Amino acid sequence: MMRVLAAMSGGVDSAVAAARAVDAGHDVVGVHLALSATPGTLRTGSRGCCSKEDAGDARRAADVLGIPFYVWDFADRFKEDVIDDFVAAYAAGETPNPCLRCNEKIKFSALADRAVALGFDAVVTGHYARLSDGVLRRAVDADKDQSYVLAVLTAEQLARAMFPVGDTPKPQIRAEAAERGLAVANKPDSHDICFIPSGDTRAFLGARIGIRPGAVVDADGQVLAEHEGVHGFTIGQRKGLGLPGPAADGKPRYVTDIDPASGTVRVGSAEDLQVRQVRAERAVWTSGRTPEGPIDCVAQVRAHGGTAPATAEAVDGGLVVRLHEPLTGVAKGQAVVLYRPDPLGDEVLGSGTISGTARTHALDGAAGASAR
């Protein structure tokens, strides 16, 4: 038996995860993270994130399970490590993943550190992933798999984590919650960013960054439009570009490059989005050991995004990932996650924060091509 802290967001997944920890014979205490100093500024129902309504749902679930329950205030830490980081990344022309950062800095760092200090052996959450003997794998339910946003965790962090729902499809989790008498059994999922209640990311960023005008240009550098800040754009974006009309060839145009220093947003064709090589910094290897030499793997560059077979190599604390097939919409600030295919469930090898890419024609030696 272990003494386990159950992080209860107020959703069905974390409630069932806590219940399964109780069933396993562990001494379980529930905790809900208060992540906002201002009531009403977090979106209710956001998976893994917490409004006042979610705190009430979590408390009621703990009552049904018969476990102690507390609310811990992590608002200041959340603002500093997640919200401020999110804003700064967009201002720098990057596209961050706040859920990944929350896992890295809050749930499995600040929360886990406090748990260990209080004598707990592990933190249990409702994440959809599988963890056994230190090996992190994709969840059984591919549509709900969250291994991508957990790939930033170190071996030490994984050693004190538990993911009890990763071996079960979501519909069965809901059915189990109903059988247990948990009122959150049919609570809707939310895939929005919890600290942007309106869902309007551009407005949220604009209020904090302000107006930083720049130009939208084509591949030849011709100015097509003006904009109010690079924070309103991400690589692969097609809508909301403010362009006066379609391209001369009639094909859609996408954001292909963002230069925060000059405020320039470059647009081009879908072909211009293709990437064959990814550079990343701050590599994390889930085994705790940095591999020597190239490794064959499968790379994923967005949560629930497509994958490509690849060869990866550790370089100067980061990664160089050579894709055997092109991927599109690869943005700086996102994570590149490396998997090893396995019939038992694809194994997470490691991750890094994308710092640059090279396009297909650049690697093929085409004249005038450039890396970004």
UniProtKB/Swiss-Prot annotation:
Family: Belongs to the MnmA/TRMU family.
Catalytic activity: S-sulfanyl-L-cysteinyl-[protein] + uridine(34) in tRNA + AH2 + ATP = 2-thiouridine(34) in tRNA + L-cysteinyl-[protein] + A + AMP + diphosphate + H(+)
One GO CC term on file: cytoplasm
Cellular compartment(s): Cytoplasm
NCBIfam families, alphabetized: PRK00143.1, trmU
The protein's name in its UniProt record: tRNA-specific 2-thiouridylase MnmA
Active site: 102 (nucleophile), 194 (cysteine persulfide intermediate)
Species for this entry: Nocardia farcinica (strain IFM 10152)
Source species, domain of life: Bacteria
Keyword vocabulary terms for this entry: ATP-binding, Cytoplasm, Disulfide bond, Nucleotide-binding, RNA-binding, Transferase, tRNA processing, tRNA-binding
Region listing for Interaction with tRNA, in residue ranges: 144-146
HAMAP family: tRNA_thiouridyl_MnmA (MF_00144)
EC class: transferase
Primary localization: cytoplasm
Keyword RNA-binding: yes
Annotated site residue numbers, Interaction with tRNA: 127, 334
EC nos: 2.8.1.13
Function: Catalyzes the 2-thiolation of uridine at the wobble position (U34) of tRNA, leading to the formation of s(2)U34.
